Amino acid sequence: MTKRITVTGVTRRLVCIIFTLVLLPFTVNAQTTPTQSAGDSNVRPPITKVDLQIVKRAREILDSPAKWNRADNRVCPAEAKTFSLYCALQMATTEIGGKAEHRGAALQEARFVIDEIAGDRNYEHRLMNYNNDQTTTFADIQEVLRITESLITLRLKGKGTH
């Protein structure tokens, strides 16, 4: 007796996003120039195990809807009790890496995930604007972090770094 596996639209979309984001670095790296600056919103820094730890920590920081600040202004006070997507990633970056990195790999990968799932919205500040978008839910924020974590894990495996 064989079982039929059905693929829902959501599953198909998730597979497409992961596939695109795993292959995208190879095409982007072939097209980037050595003069790309750290201020470039599409810069793609190399991924390390630290980036995976940063995204996992950001998920811990934002582990409940009560901790989510959906009114981000990209100012992240140390004493904050609620956190936007951007501030959770920045706080995790500072805790784990020792300093904030606005264009660090973990934040950049999260930006690229937002590009894929909300590319038609053309956000000026992807992390802030996606966080503040009235159609964005806490589950959506968690999904961005989950996909980002999965992509970084896949890319590390591809580099032979587990």
Where do the protein language model's features map onto the residues?
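Short N-proximal segments of mature Sec-exported proteins
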Residues: 52-112
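Bacterial N-terminal signal peptides
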Residues: 14-26
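Compact alpha-helical subdomains of small soluble proteins
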Residues: 93-162
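Bacterial N-terminal signal peptides that target proteins for export
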Residues: 2-15
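N-terminal low-complexity, Pro/Thr/Ser-rich intrinsically disordered segments
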Residues: 34-58
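Short, solvent-exposed segments of well-ordered alpha helices
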Residues: 45-49, 75-79, 132
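Acidic/histidine-rich, surface-exposed loop or edge segments in extracytoplasmic proteins
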Residues: 36-42, 87-90, 123-126
